[in-house]
């Protein structure tokens, strides 16, 4: 998206440098198209097109700066595939950084080799306990627990990435990936990202779950890191 918009911007600038400059200035000054076009002889249609492209480029550039991390998953040591997650560092920077650093293992501990210990079909897949491996442990990069950052992002559907907790302000390293919309968790669990690739892998993991949460196969994060 960024490269596509950049190409359009180059083409637009080449066709009408004046329109491009005015479009850019109009956005920066928060001026209307009418006001900007009335101050010059540039065609209104050209100016409108320019403003649209500059805005899309700005939006795409911002989106491209969000960190992405991955899990390479196995079930009973058989490869399942890769899950790629985009972290909302723009909304919950502290929570996103915790997850990112645990994916890379740069603090000396993290998700590599850990399991998904609780998987409930039509609900979620939970992991992140790399200390006790049963849902009772884990720790954050900030120490043991850290506070809820905010609840701006919601549990809107499949692929949403959220912090597991034992109550308010008890975030550590445990997390879950939703497989359905879970609105009842809004304002109780901090959403900090979503799956952008490999949702089919999440569905495979879900298929090994049960209503009790016990998995029929050992689901392991064989490798993890940043992209």
From Swiss-Prot:
> What does it catalyze?
[protein]-peptidylproline (omega=180) = [protein]-peptidylproline (omega=0)
| Biological processes, Gene Ontology terms | protein folding; response to oxidative stress
* Phosphoserine found at: 158
Provide the E.C. number(s) assigned to this enzyme: 5.2.1.8
**Keywords on this record?**
Cytoplasm, Isomerase, Phosphoprotein, Rotamase
* Molecular function (Gene Ontology), one example: cyclosporin A binding
**What PROSITE patterns has UniProt attached to this entry?**
CSA_PPIASE_1 (PS00170), CSA_PPIASE_2 (PS50072)
Q: What is this protein called?
A: Peptidyl-prolyl cis-trans isomerase
UniProt lists the gene as Cyp1
């Amino acid at each position: 998206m960024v490269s596509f918009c950049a190409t359009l911007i180059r083409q637009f600038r080449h066709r009408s440098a004046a329109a491009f400059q005015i479009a850019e200035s109009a956005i920066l000054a928060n001026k209307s198209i009418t006001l900007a076009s009335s101050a010059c002889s540039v065609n209104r249609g050209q100016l409108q097109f320019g403003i649209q492209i500059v805005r899309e480029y700005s939006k795409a550039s911002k989106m491209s700066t969000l960190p992405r991390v991955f899990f390479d998953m196995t079930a009973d040591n058989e490869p399942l595939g890769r899950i790629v997650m985009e972290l909302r560092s723009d909304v919950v920077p502290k929570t996103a950084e915790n997850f990112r650093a645990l994916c890379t293992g740069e603090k000396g501990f993290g998700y590599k080799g850990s399991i998904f210990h609780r998987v409930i079909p039509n609900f979620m897949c939970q992991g992140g306990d790399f200390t006790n491996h049963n849902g009772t442990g884990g720790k954050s990069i900030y120490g043991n627990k850290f506070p809820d950052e905010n609840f701006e992002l919601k549990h809107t559907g499949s692929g949403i990435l959220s912090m597991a907790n034992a109550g308010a302000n008890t975030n550590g390293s445990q997390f879950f990936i939703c497989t359905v919309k879970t609105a009842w968790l809004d304002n109780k669990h901090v959403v900090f990202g979503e799956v952008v690739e490999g949702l089919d892998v999440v569905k495979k993991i879900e298929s090994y779950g049960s209503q009790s949460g016990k998995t029929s196969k050992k689901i392991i994060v064989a490798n993890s890191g940043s992209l």
